[in-house]
A protein has these predicted regions:
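Protease-domain processing segments flanking chymotrypsin-fold serine proteases, especially trypsin-like
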Residues: 17-46, 221-225
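Terminal peptide-recognition signature
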Residues: 34-36, 51, 58-62, 85, ...
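Sec-dependent N-terminal signal peptides
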Residues: 4-13
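A conserved glycine-rich beta-strand in the N-terminal activation segment of trypsin-fold
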Residues: 20-23, 38-57, 63, 81-84, ...
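Flexible, gly/ser-rich surface segments that form the specificity/activation loops bordering the active-site cleft
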Residues: 21-25, 108-156, 164-167, 183-194
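C-terminal cap/linker of serine protease catalytic domains
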Residues: 20-27, 108, 132, 179-225
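Short conserved beta-strand and strand-loop elements enriched in small hydrophobics
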Residues: 36, 71-79, 124-129, 146
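Catalytic-histidine neighborhood of serine endopeptidases
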Residues: 48, 55-107, 119-120, 188
């Protein structure tokens, strides 16, 4: 009997360890995740957050709330190298997303955006910022609990896992390692679950001539596209 209990316990421990092991692709994709620091006009820090690159030229997605009222911003990669945020390419205050151009001296690592939306029950993984040579030790792992329409062909997702403090705006991936969303808190204040706004939607944003006097953009002192 004791032997059976021991075998069952050992099996449980092995399963738990396996379930908590980060997918192999995370070690590669972590290079595209950066920290963001925005500054006021007097040079003092306004906000800190997370962003991630979606092409090798330095296009980055992040949260609009991190940039609102900012006069300057920089990003820092896992190796401690900093780059200036050059331009705002598009923004949506309602859904708290922003698209930016970062000035980098060379091509950067970036995340592939999922071409297809996820459906209820599919696995979802969140990758926080991880420093250079560190392994991914903490990450979000769960399922898509609910899918709602955002705009046009874009979606908003409810996820089965709660967010840690430093996970806000981190990229959320499908099982293949393609990013499909930016992590967001539950607006109701509950901590049992989290949400993800479509990364494809954020990447579709652009600035038009009609936005010249739009407060969404005039509240940010960084150059617009």
């Amino acid at each position: 009997m004791k032997k059976i209990v021991w075998i069952l316990l050992l099996g449980t421990l092995v399963w738990t360890a396996f379930a908590q092991k980060a997918p192999k692709w995370m070690d590669k994709e972590k290079k595209a995740v950066v920290t963001v620091t925005t500054y006021k006009a007097d040079g003092t820090t306004l906000h800190n957050g997370i962003g991630f690159f979606v092409d090798e030229e330095g296009t980055m997605l992040s949260a609009y709330s991190v940039f609102k009222d900012a006069q300057k911003a920089i990003v820092t990669d896992g190796n401690g190298v900093t780059y200036p945020v050059e331009r705002v390419l598009g923004a949506d205050e309602l859904y708290d997303v922003i698209k930016l151009k970062v000035r980098a001296p060379k091509k950067v690592s970036y995340l592939e955006i999922a071409s297809q939306p996820l459906s209820t029950g599919q696995p979802a993984y969140l990758l926080p910022f991880v420093k250079g040579k560190e392994k991914v030790a903490s990450f979000g792992n769960g399922k898509v609990e609910e899918v709602t329409k955002l705009k046009d062909s874009y979606h908003y997702y409810k996820l089965s896992f709660p967010l840690q403090v430093d996970w806000l705006n981190a990229p959320v991936f499908n099982e293949a390692g393609e990013v499909f969303g930016l992590a967001q808190d539950d607006a109701s204040g509950k901590k049992e679950a989290s949400y993800a706004v479509s990364a494809a939607y954020a990447n579709s944003l652009s600035v038009s001539s009609a936005d010249a006097f739009n407060t969404i953009y005039t509240s940010i002192g960084i150059k617009k596209a």
